[in-house]
Structures are given as structure tokens and as C-alpha cells.
Amino acid sequence: MNVFSKKVIISFILIVMGLTFVACTSSDKTKEKNLKRSQDTEFASDSGVRIEKLSEVQQKNLHTLAKVWGFTKYRHPEITAGNVNWDAELFRVIPKVLEATTKEEAGDIMATWLNQFPFQVNTLSKEQEDLYHQVKEKVYLDVEYSWIKNRQVLGNNLADYLENLSEVKVTDNDNGYAVFEEGDIVNVSSDSFMDNSINYEDTGMRLLGLFRYWNIIEYFYPYKNLMDEDWDQVLYDKIPELALQGDKESYVLSIANLTTYIHDSHGFFNDNFKVLQQHFGAYKAKASIFNIDGQIVIAGREDKSPLKVGDIVVAIDGTTIEKIIEECNKYISVSDKNRFTNAFDYYLLRSTKEIAEIEVIRNGEKLSLNVPCYYNSKYDVKRLGQDEKSCFMGDKKIGYINIATLESGDLDKLMKKFKGTEGLIIDARFDNVKMSEYLKFINYPIGEYIKPKVSEYQQFYSSNSFEPGKFIKSTSNSSGRGFIAEQLDKGIDSTTFSKIFDNGIIRTSLGKVKDRYQYNGKVIILMNECTQSVLETMVMSFMDAPNATVIGTPSAGANGNIMDITLPGCIQTSISGLAVTYMDGSQTQRIGLKPDITVKQTVKGIAEGKDEVIEKAIELITKPESK
């Protein structure tokens, strides 16, 4: 299927596909078993590649091989058809490349290897040709691969092969390693060879982890232009590290470090053996933190903990908190190193012991506390205000909606109560884990209330399926009064539409839209660095509401869908799969959304149990002259 051939519920596709990825996993594995490439099992348990020493020539040749392997992987017709196990082919050619004593010899080896896979440059149909030229006019980001013409490095034979391959336009990738799905979404879940445990002494498997991840970023990461480091240099520098360190911990930590170079708070990392978790300590205090200008402040804790809300953490088991934050930055990807509450919360309060010595500052006094910690703790400690129920505020003059505690069907009941109030506070500072599907759609019905007309608020940029590595201007997202009915009027199947929204937004198999009134009071949206991903989308959708004001601090700066990646050794990580900007093209990734009015929570306020951001919101509604 061509990426641009079908558009279903386009305005919702980013969100819908985000829900679909998990459901697709088992079916993808079933399909994989039926592909020709799955029959090549020679290296299923071991690549047979071992490297004890690595010369500069070998490092350079492996660097070239990684790029050649990746460029071919996403373009060659036999590979995109699912007929060639390209991971296995990597293991077949690595030993030969390692034996080469010059770049010229390595280039000839790679050319001979690739010539086993001949191809013809395809001719597009009239429909495909028209579509291709339409796509070319929408280019947003272009991969740089002039290196395929560098004959001094590659040699004539290899350069000829790659240049010829660059003329191929990918028109069918349903069975490839990167499948283009509806909504221009790229799914790489089928690229999961050796997703189980590996022999960590196996150099080939370790290099596969590096090469796979590097090339996924090279060709399918829409924010490559926002990376600080030279991605090509990162590959070169990482080769000795992955080639020579032959144990589980060094491999997992090296891959974790690799993911930080994309600077993306969607870059979640998990290894089934909990290596990263163990690195910071197997035991965790049952407490949550909040970052206030670089200070780690306790924002919630279990009742029996000697920690108190408002404590400033100074050190844990003798290691300064600054050193621990530095270590987190080394292994955990964040869009902005100064906004890390979401990403680091799980790792900061860890210890190798059941009782951690945590130094804090409380009311200006330094204290040393013996804090109970729990092994592999799946803690659920709410931050100040996170579990606040939606309610009336300010003598029932203000309606307060906490997105984090909304349940299915709540919104319309609340808005019925809040009709006629002077103002509405929408709190988008906390994620709603239990009701994630509801949360992902909630901005649409809210928009029906607070936006008198439909407006676009978010522009998407997606991969060009014809030419891997190129990104194009894609669809936009809209919300506002009449938007849901507008989608039904476009002929979208009402049963399917209602099924998707059967979570309190639409509750009829006929697709009938709820009758929602126009809310005319002031609207204050609360935001901070914990406002991430779908919450950022929500805030963006409300920004142009006529009576809306966004207050708080900048958001996390990680927007777009999440693309899951599997790497050898039971490693799962992810990236943002679509680029997102404001409608005028202004950047949101890494820098976050900017509030209209900056309001910061203070350490003193947290210690006293005050929510200073809500206090300011109430003031803005009840005392308009203070705005």
C-alpha cells in the first residue's frame, strides 16, 4: 500500500494510529513468519562474528558498511518485498569486510556482495508518477546521501550500484522492514530479528543493534534537523564501543546512550533484564519529584516515608543529585535537558540498598534521612494536585477540569454543571494513564464547547514512502465547534467513527453528534514541563479559542506519534514518528509550547501544599484587571 493512497479520518490519524500500534504487534509477528526472509535462520542464535581488536581501517570500513547496508535495506525491491533477511546478510558480509586492509578492498567486497541482489529501476504508473510529483512539491526535510557518490571511499563498482539504486522509487513496502500505514505512519515493528536474549559476546549482534537503530533514525526520524550532534560521526564513534565491549551491561548502556542523541522525550527505553534500572539502583523510594529550576523537589511520597513534600534533594547515598542528573542525561533521552521531570522521575530516587541515605534541605536546614526503598517498585505516588477531582472553584463561579482524573463520560456532565460560570480552568499538567484512550480524544469535544468555529492548529510532516529519508508536509489537525459533525458529513463510516469515539465523546452507533452549547466564559489552560505529547496536542488545539489564556511554564517539547523500535537483546525503545509544528511552521519539538503568562510553582508553595498556578488562574478569572 502506498502511504498516500488512503486517507481515513485524516484529522484524527496521528492519534488513532498511536492507539493501533500495540494491537498490531501480534499480527505483525504472524505475517513475518510467512515471509521468505523468515526462512533464513542461519544466524538465529549467533552471528558468528567476534572482534577482539579493531583497527582504524576496520572501523572506517564498518562505518561505510553500516550506511551501505541501511541505504539498501529500505530501497531494494527484493528487501522491501520481504524476500531477503537483511540482518543475516549483514552477518555474512561483516567477516569479509573485517578482513579488508584498505577502503578500496572493502568497497569491492561490498560491491560483490550487493551484486548478488540485482534489480531494475522501476517505472511508475501514471497515477504513481502524478503522486510522486505532488509529493516532491511538499518536501520538508531531505536526507543527505551525497556519500553514495564518493568514489574515493566506495570505489566505482559500489558507487555505481548505490547510485543506480537511488533511482528506485519504493511503491510497495508492505513486507519491508519499514511499513507505511494509513496516515503516513511508519511502522518498523517487523524489524525485530533477535528481539530475544542474545549472547552478549556476539559482536555481530551488538553491531546489529547499532546499525539498525542508526539507520531508522537516519531515514525515518522527522526531527533529525534538530539534533545537536553530527549523526554520521555518532555512528563512527559508537562502532568501537559496540564492537569491543562484550557484556550485557555495557551493551545495554551503550544503546541507551545512543538513544539520547536524538534529544526526544518520546525516546523511551526499556530492557527486559532491567539493566538500566539496576544501573541507577534496584531499589526505589516511593516518592515523586518535580524539577524547579534544576532543584529536585519532593512532590509526593508514601505516608510512612521520612521525606516530606517540599524537601529539596541534595544527595543520595553520598552521590550528589547533580551527579545523578548528569548520569540520567547520559542514558535517558529528553527533548530539553532542563525539563526532565517526566523522563527522570523513575530513576532519580534509586539506591542499591533497601534503606537509602537521602540528604535534603527542609526549611533551610540540611537533613540526612534513612528512606525505605523497594525492589523493582511499581510505585504510583501522585504529585501535588495530580489526583484533584474536577469540581467547582471560587464560590461556584469557576469550573475546574483536571484531565488526569477524567473518566469516560465525565466531560459532558461537568460542562452541564459549569454552564454559566465566569471561567473554566483546564488542567493539562498531568497525564491520565488509566484513561489514555479517552484522553487522546478529549480535545475534540472540549473544542466543541470553547471554540466557536473549526480551525487548524497543528501541522504534520511525514516520511515520503517513495524515497526513504525524505519528509513532506502532510495533513493538519483541526478542532472547534462543528468539527465532529463535519467529519461525519465527509462520508466517514459512522459506525467506525462512533466506535473509535465510544468513550464519552460519541455514544451512538448512528454517529449522532452530541448537542454541546457554546461556552462564553474565560478559559485558562494550565501547562508545565510535564505537559507532553498528547497533552501538548490538546493545549495547541485550545490556544486559538477566543477567550483562552495558557499559563504556567513551557511544555516538554515531544509531540507527534510514537514509533516503537525493537533491538537485539530484549531492548525496546521509541521515537517521535511524525514531525509536528504550529500551522505557520513554527517549531514545538524540543522547545515546547510557550505559555501566554509564565507562572512557576515554587518550593515554598509545594511545601505548603499550595498550587500557585491554579491560584493565578482563579485570579485571572475573578480579577481581570490583574492580567
Residue ranges and their predicted role:
Residues 140-167, 302-303, 308-421, 592-601:
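C-terminal, low-ordered peptide segments at domain boundaries
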Residues 57-58, 63-70, 137-179, 186, ...:
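PDZ/PDZ-like domain segments forming the peptide/carboxylate-binding groove
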Residues 22-23:
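C-terminal motif of bacterial Sec signal peptides marking the signal peptidase cleavage site
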Residues 68, 72-76, 213, 306-339, ...:
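Conserved PDZ fold ligand-binding element
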Residues 43, 57, 73, 82, ...:
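Cleft-lining beta-strand/loop regions that shape enzyme active-site pockets
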Residues 2-10:
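Bacterial N-terminal signal peptides that target proteins for export
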Residues 64, 80-87, 91, 95-191, ...:
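Extended, small/polar residue-biased N-terminal targeting/export presequences
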